[in-house]
Amino acid sequence: ATQPDFAARKDLDWTPREIIPENKKMFAALRRTEIEWRLDRKTSLETVAEEMSPLDSVCTIVNLRRHARQIADALYQSCPKNTVFFLTTDLCPAHRSRQIEIIRQRLHEGKPCRVVATQCIEAGVDLDFKTVYRALAPLDAIIQAAGRCNRNGCDQMGRVIVFCPEDSRRLYPDDWYNNAAVTVQEMSPPFSIHDPDNIREYYQRLFDGSTDKKTLTEAIDARSFAQTAAQYKLIDNTGVQIIVPYAEKRELYKSI
């Protein structure tokens, strides 16, 4: 996982220590991808689908489910349906796991595989694509997406394209995600995501711009309970749990 620059946090009462000497050389030696920054213009979702169509090992990761649906729908029109896979939290966990197993098997066998997904594919999913498209996102999310490209370190470098989706409506799930993505833009790409100095700069900018977090931290440090209460806000739990009678669990659902 991408580690934040903890050394930049002056409010911490501990100092991290680098355990790998000359880690910059390690980053360079382990580089498996080339990053193409396409942020000087907006890219339509239809264009992304068109570019994915002729590729046989490609994954596009976007920030919103409706963007994933648009790209997948376009691919269904231009590619054999059994080569297109759609992964979002609209699918129940069991369904997603089954789809991931099918994708992994197809990739292993060298069969065409075009995947459109949201962030649910970025962590804990061991898939390896030749090409990955990533909608502009926080830097750690871009690095996670790049981890799905040339994961096995083949001779040829993997290709990661970071693009800004064309959409008149919101582009990100929430304000924090938006601010973190804007921070990436403010660093004036192109730059290497494999350089620890760039990762450090990103987190420094993010920490410096997080005024709400600073205010809350200062209130806690000052033991100002009234100010802490005013600043602190729990994440709203607006989700509703549902039962999905999927696959072999369908009979169990009926029996209940």
Which residues are covered by each model-predicted region?
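A conditional alpha-helix N-cap/helix-loop micro-motif detector
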Residues: 41-45, 96, 114
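Interdomain hinge/linker at the junction between the two RecA-like core domains of SF2 helicases
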Residues: 2-52
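Conserved two-lobed SF2 helicase motor
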Residues: 106-122, 134
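A short helix-to-beta-strand connector/capping loop
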Residues: 30-33, 80-83, 111-112
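Conserved ATPase-coupling elements of RecA-like P-loop NTPase cores
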Residues: 125-129
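A short beta-strand-to-loop transition that corresponds to the Sensor-1 phosphate-sensing loop
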Residues: 1-3, 62-65, 117-120, 136
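Flexible, active-site-adjacent loop/turn segments at secondary-structure boundaries
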Residues: 28, 33, 89, 119, ...
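C-terminal helicase lobe and adjacent C-terminal extensions/tails of nucleic-acid helicase motors
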Residues: 46-55, 61, 66, 70-97, ...
